[in-house]
Amino acid sequence: MNPYQNKNEYEIFNAPSNGFSKSNNYSRYPLANKPNQPLKNTNYKDWLNVCQDNQQYGNNAGNFASSETIVGVSAGIIVVGTMLGAFAAPVLAAGIISFGTLLPIFWQGSDPANVWQDLLNIGGRPIQEIDKNIINVLTSIVTPIKNQLDKYQEFFDKWEPARTHANAKAVHDLFTTLEPIIDKDLDMLKNNASYRIPTLPAYAQIATWHLNLLKHAATYYNIWLQNQGINPSTFNSSNYYQGYLKRKIQEYTDYCIQTYNAGLTMIRTNTNATWNMYNTYRLEMTLTVLDLIAIFPNYDPEKYPIGVKSELIREVYTNVNSDTFRTITELENGLTRNPTLFTWINQGRFYTRNSRDILDPYDIFSFTGNQMAFTHTNDDRNIIWGAVHGNIISQDTSKVFPFYRNKPIDKVEIVRHREYSDIIYEMIFFSNSSEVFRYSSNSTIENNYKRTDSYMIPKQTWKNEEYGHTLSYIKTDNYIFSVVRERRRVAFSWTHTSVDFQNTIDLDNITQIHALKALKVSSDSKIVKGPGHTGGDLVILKDSMDFRVRFLKNVSRQYQVRIRYATNAPKTTVFLTGIDTISVELPSTTSRQNPNATDLTYADFGYVTFPRTVPNKTFEGEDTLLMTLYGTPNHSYNIYIDKIEFIPITQSVLDYTEKQNIEKTQKIVNDLFVN
């Protein structure tokens, strides 16, 4: 017996949770066909039938993408993970990634065009119909570039250990031929209005290749010339390409954000769009574009002459189990968190209600809401319970489950009614394919009325490295839209596995600590939504913010401390306390009047370094340190803090700083002679 067979109001609801899913192997009303057919979610099995050679990108796509985009999204995750690892290499030329590492990600399987077609499908979600000619245009661009970059890498690998005149000439000549071609191709994609939005994920990948190539020139161009007996000149030197690289970082970052926002607006203003459509575009673009441009600043050799330990602290959402009968704005408010400090799940309380109909013989226990407990970064002592989410009544029962940091949740399965995706009976939480715990409503409904859906952002493995996401929060919509009270929309949010709980300060790399990884901020300070290109949200600093970092035990090292920030405030002073008290004056970084955080461009951010180093301290026992950044209470201007960076005073940094000072002095002397 179907305990809901008389509730005809439900028939207007769609069961599939993904607005873009093309799978239709099961009837919308399965009870009318084969009531005993098992209904394990088969979306990914469908994708395997559609995507050729998809297995190299992972075997568990869950409910987060469609067959038309999964290969492209997977490639994007791998590229970002690869770059995070490469930037952390503690060598002088950190951030120079071999094209032999980057390019094979995009050319795999029997039809390498799959990746580029999927990237177009991601970018084209806001558009009703994509010009089919675009894929031909795109492949005609990327294939020759790939061939030339392969050749360039071959020449570079031959030159590096044997820096002869001939080897230097070969790599130098190919660079000067290839670089303007890539620049011209990117301009063509940007300047064609019909190409901009659909090609954005592909554009971001090609732009990454261009920045990587320019980083080669910024580092090695003078050496190539010297190997050939040529003296560097104003427009023919490593210094020139360093400046050119910095301009391109800004150009590509701003273009990607502007184009992404244009696509997001198109979906949001489309009256036929659902929240899942909106969220799918946001999720896929985050994984293929926004995560990428968030680490573009690391290519700047002036700011990052050595390795950089970077993190992505943004939070992304898998699609909700039902998004009908509410607007995008309503569901955005009901399912996503307001900007907050970075949190780590500690416990979860799950609520259950018996919605038994007196005419039915079943106890229809189902999920009705949740409450999450969490800690902040490097703080296991203070457990904070958040708000209760869902429409809870006094008759509801609840049970608390622990979450373990050494067993991060990377997949959630929802067991729900086979027809109605928002009637939930169980949630099963997994870590590395093993069940950690299971919430159950203990409903007596028969199993043939149940269906299981998976929610995850699949892990990707590349060159023996694994890149993934872990569950960061659960939120149930408070809105009740039916006389039957057990229907619930629930959303899962995820964060990148690059995030370090302890804020460990690296010995040999520059360590970036996002402002959102603070323990707390003063009551007059505020967390605000970021502009999209910083890898997370921002802190408006007024009085103070506290954060805890971890230094390695029994090791002594001095550090310079630097802040990445944005403000139109006149000169203000900030203080940093911890080992010692140091201060620095913050110049304004933008002349714009009271800019909103979401509107901040790349150029609106600046850096300031404290003039005194954090002195040597050897930690023999307790290796964590509480530090506080003080601003100006009740300041009328906003100071947006993005990151606090710790720069180790190593010989590599000292050598690079001395080299930069010599080059700046030489430029001043040259300018004097010219004038």
UniProtKB/Swiss-Prot annotation:
Q: Which InterPro entries match?
A: Galactose-bd-like_sf, Pest_crys_dom-III, Pest_crys_dom_I, Pest_crys_N_sf, Pest_cryst_cen_dom_sf, Pest_cryst_dom_II
Q: Does the keyword Protein biosynthesis apply?
A: no
GO BP terms in the entry? sporulation resulting in formation of a cellular spore; symbiont-mediated killing of host cell
Which CDD domains does this chain map to?
A: delta_endotoxin_C (cd04085)
Please give one Gene Ontology molecular function term for this protein: signaling receptor binding
Source organism superkingdom: Bacteria
Q: Does the keyword tRNA-binding apply?
A: no
| Record key words, sorted | Sporulation, Toxin, Virulence
A Pfam cross-reference name? Endotoxin_C
> What SUPFAM superfamilies does the record tag this protein with?
delta-Endotoxin (insectocide), middle domain, delta-Endotoxin (insectocide), N-terminal domain, Galactose-binding domain-like
State any further remark: Toxic segment of the protein is located in the N-terminus.
UniProt record similarity statement: Belongs to the delta endotoxin family.
Physiological role: Promotes colloidosmotic lysis by binding to the midgut epithelial cells of mosquitos. Active on Aedes aegypti.
Recorded protein name is Pesticidal crystal protein Cry10Aa
- Please name the source species: Bacillus thuringiensis subsp. israelensis
